[in-house]
Design a protein with these regions (language model features):
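Short active-site oxyanion
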Residues: 27, 80-83, 117, 168
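Acidic, proline/glycine-enriched N-terminal capping motif
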Residues: 1-62, 67-69, 195
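Short hydrophobic/aromatic beta-strand micro-patches
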Residues: 30, 85-87, 171-173
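Well-ordered mid-protein domain cores that form the structural environment of catalytic cofactors
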Residues: 46-104
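Hydrophobic (often cysteine-bearing) scaffold residues that line and stabilize catalytic clefts
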Residues: 32, 36, 94, 122
């Protein structure tokens, strides 16, 4: 929803405690295979080779004429593995454009928009709230991400700034999203509406 309780109350949660946002509607894509880096450097506005493994990069998805299609957050796992996050309103168009543009037969493009839940945490207590639920030794710093397994399921945790510069974003299998959301609220997160 765009709002749970009171807009001011939700805003204050992100400034003085921890707000939690369901951002599952954002586009989520995975590109893997030899030549993935080179292919993305032809489709995105930044030099992907400047992004290190385990880091994120804000970039733009371009049309074949060089026009801006969407803002993309790129997570580089390796030169052959990338996770891409696009805006909700452009998710289908982004995937179609990527699919049309992939020229290497060894590359695999997957649309994970409906398969993955996305939850954002924002506020000074975000790290503390997440640490109560996910007992990681270290949480990613700004511009970083990490993968982890929980209950046999692969998850991704980013600090890519999808909601704000300081937000944490959790990507987990859709079937586990409600459980994560409820556990994070029990740990102190206050639900907030999203207009992404």
């Amino acid at each position: 929803p765009q709002q749970y309780t009171d807009l001011i109350e939700e805003h204050m949660a992100t400034r003085s405690a921890c707000g939690i946002f369901d951002i599952s509607h954002v586009g989520k894509f995975r590109l893997t295979g030899n030549g993935a880096l080179e292919q993305l450097e032809q489709l995105l506005s930044n030099r992907i080779s400047d992004c290190c493994d385990g880091h994120t990069q804000q970039t733009l998805l371009l049309t074949d004429k060089g026009m801006i299609m969407d803002r993309i957050t790129l997570c580089r796992e390796s030169a052959g593995r990338f996770f891409l996050i696009g805006s909700a309103s452009q998710a289908d168009a982004d995937f179609d454009s990527l699919q049309r543009s992939i020229r290497h037969g060894s590359l695999k493009l997957e649309n994970e928009t409906d398969r993955l839940c996305a939850i954002a945490l924002l506020g000074p207590d975000a790290d503390k709230v997440l640490s109560k639920v996910h007992f990681a030794a270290e949480l990613p710093q700004r511009g970083e991400f990490c993968s982890f397994r929980r209950g046999g399921q692969q998850c991704l945790l980013t600090r890519a700034g999808l909601v704000s510069d300081e937000s944490l974003e959790l990507f987990c299998p859709a079937a586990t999203g409600i459980a994560w959301f409820e556990q994070l609220m029990t740990a102190g997160a206050i639900p907030c509406g999203s207009r992404l």
